[in-house]
Regions:
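Broad, structure-driven detector of short, well-ordered beta-strand segments within folded domains
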Residues: 151-153, 240-242, 257, 321-329, ...
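A broadly conserved sequence feature marking short terminus-proximal activation segments
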Residues: 171-231, 236-238, 370-385
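Cys/His-rich short segments
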Residues: 217-272
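Long, charge-rich boundary regions
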Residues: 258-338
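Phosphoinositide-binding peripheral membrane targeting modules
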Residues: 309-361, 372-379
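Short, acidic/hydrophobic/Gly-rich beta-strand patch recurrent on exposed beta strands
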Residues: 363-367
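Terminal and domain-flanking low-complexity segments
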Residues: 381-398
């Protein structure tokens, strides 16, 4: 068989491992609870929960095996270090879309005695709670036909949240254990495997913090969180929340909340409406939007903004035009000017039940191999797009 995926280059990966080990030990204070891969020989698959962008650093440091990571194609195309990523044996793929060539590459890793790592959720959490895990993990694990291990991380969200402008030093833990042998997997149904994966990879960082009670340096800083918690729970107005240091404040009604170094919120004055766990605030906003969508016939969401696409030679996103982006219960519509030419594209949400996004900045829509990055005029609306898509996708799958 002609190799499509290289085993990680031993020299490049050794340097990569050393860097990860130093960061995990001294910067992230990684604590490994157990590592059942220590005595494992031969190929295997690792499935991991995804709390933050630093998760791969801690996993690499803890597991002394050359790992082939499945990573976002957007990340691969725009980081500017393709040659190094190739040397590390990564498999780039479109998020939430798995092509036959992707499957062949993943299969090839384990057939060549390698270690394949997958993040089934595909996205980092924006609120400390695990994102939706697509129901395709069971089929993939059955296809790979190898022992499967879980790498379960806690604390990386509180260390480096997706929305945060600052890093917070505290504690990250990692638990690596055998989920099922290939023989056990062959005896399980796809539905049983899907349920098992969801059960073992689900997390709630704020519930965990109630027991762990770990302080994080700068852990009370909420700047950037207003791009996720964008609606005031007191006056229920959107995009009015501001954040400075450890304090949220509504610019409309004056409602305030203060964060502590554990990541919990408290009221500042009598009459403030505050959720101790930020994810509960997120859920409150989500339910309000869900009710609005349910009660509004033919609900649509529209925004005007700039459109970017990946420039291959430059290995980065570049602006190509301006569009109006519209979302309804079935599809996205992109309508405007691209490269000074009329542009219209319709993308079914069945192809994109979830979107890569940067809170307060942008979201990405995938159409086959093409990635479109949309930057709305008001970045605060990005999270509303994400919530609306979740609601529509949930209705479609119900």
């Amino acid at each position: 068989m002609k190799k499509r995926v290289k085993r990680p280059n031993i020299f490049v990966y050794s340097l990569f491992f050393l860097i990860c080990k130093v960061l995990a030990t001294f910067k992230f204070k990684l604590k490994v609870i157990r590592n059942e891969l220590k005595k494992k020989k031969g190929p295997c698959v690792i499935i991991a929960n995804h709390e933050a962008s630093i998760d791969f650093i801690n996993l690499t440091a803890a597991v002394k095996r050359r790992i082939n990571y499945v990573i976002s194609n957007s990340f691969y195309q725009t980081l500017g270090i393709k040659s190094l990523l190739n040397a590390c044996g990564v498999i780039p793929k479109q998020q939430f879309q798995t092509a036959i060539t992707d499957l062949k590459k993943m299969k090839e890793v384990v057939q060549n005695n390698g270690t394949l790592t997958i993040y089934p959720a595909g996205l980092m959490t924006e609120n400390g709670v695990s994102t939706i895990i697509p129901g395709s993990s069971g089929k993939l694990l059955k296809f790979l036909k190898e022992d499967v291990y879980v790498a379960y991380t806690t604390g990386s969200y509180l260390t480096h949240p997706k929305w945060s402008k600052v890093y917070r030093k505290g504690r990250i833990t990692l638990d690596v254990y055998l989920l099922a042998t290939k023989e056990e997997i062959s005896q399980m149904s796809v539905e049983e495997l899907d349920a098992l994966v969801i059960d073992r990879l689900s997390f709630n960082e704020y519930e965990n913090q109630e027991t762990a009670q770990i302080e994080y340096k700068n852990g009370d800083n909420v700047e950037g969180f207003e791009n996720v918690l964008h609606l005031c729970p007191k006056c229920q107005k959107e995009f009015v929340m501001t954040a400075s240091g450890n304090t949220f404040k509504c610019s409309s009604c004056g409602n305030q909340a203060r964060s502590n170094k554990f990541g919990f919120l408290t009221n500042i004055k009598d009459g403030d409406i505050v959720f101790k766990h930020p994810n509960k605030w997120y859920d409150y906003i989500y339910e309000l939007l869900k009710n609005e969508i349910t009660q509004t016939e033919n609900y649509t969401l529209s925004s005007h903004g700039k459109l970017q696409m990946i420039e291959g030679k430059k290995q980065k996103f570049v602006e190509v035009g301006e569009i109006d982006l519209t979302l309804n219960s079935k599809e996205f519509t992109l309508n405007g000017q691209v490269h000074n030419q009329p542009f219209n594209l319709v993308v079914s949400i069945a192809k994109s039940p979830m979107l890569p996004f940067s809170p307060g900045k942008s979201l990405e829509i995938q159409d086959g191999p093409t990635i479109y990055r949309f930057i709305p005029e008001d970045g605060k609306i990005v999270i509303k797009w994400i919530m609306a898509l979740k609601i529509f996708a949930a209705k479609q799958s119900a």
